Design a protein with these regions (language model features):
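Glycine-centered, phosphate/nucleic-acid-interacting loop/turn motifs that mediate DNA/RNA or nucleotide
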Residues: 64
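N-terminal helix-turn-helix DNA-binding core of bacterial DNA-binding proteins
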Residues: 10-54
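Intrinsically disordered, low-complexity serine/threonine- and proline-rich regulatory segments
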Residues: 1-17, 95
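Short beta-strand "wing" residues that participate in macromolecule-binding interfaces
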Residues: 68
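Short, hydrophobic-biased segments on the C-terminal half of alpha helices
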Residues: 54-61
């Protein structure tokens, strides 16, 4: 990686973990698309727009990881709500385990390399 490419690296990492972040956000609560966009916007480093979230939600639905239902809204037209499917729970559990191992390995390597050459 060359100097100045860190922004691209962060974007690639975010793109890789975003589906699992969305699955995690649906773990305990059904949400509609704009609600997810707004919530992600409040998390440092996860800012994303509707042009990213809606295609992602459609892909997660096609993969059977989320399910949808239409619900009436107090204001405006009905909204499509997304909830975590059983397959989504399994995918999130597998990702979480893999993420924890990878994160711990990288943290360990960075800590050791700061103290002594590897």
């Amino acid at each position: 990686m060359l100097a100045g490419e860190a922004g691209n690296l962060v974007a690639q990492m975010r793109r890789g973990v975003l589906p699992y972040c969305v699955l995690a956000m649906l773990t305990n609560k059904e949400q509609y698309g704009f609600e997810l966009v707004h919530a992600l916007g409040g998390i440092d480093g996860m800012v994303t727009g509707e042009g990213t979230i809606y295609p992602l939600l459609a892909r997660l639905r096609r993969q059977g990881l989320v399910e949808t239902s239409w619900q009436e809204s107090a204001v405006g037209p009905p909204r499509k709500y997304y909830r975590l499917a059983e397959a989504g729970q399994a995918a999130l559990a597998e990702f979480t385990e893999s993420w924890e191992r990878l994160r711990d390995s990288v943290d360990d390597l960075l800590a050791r390399s700061a103290q002594e050459p590897l």
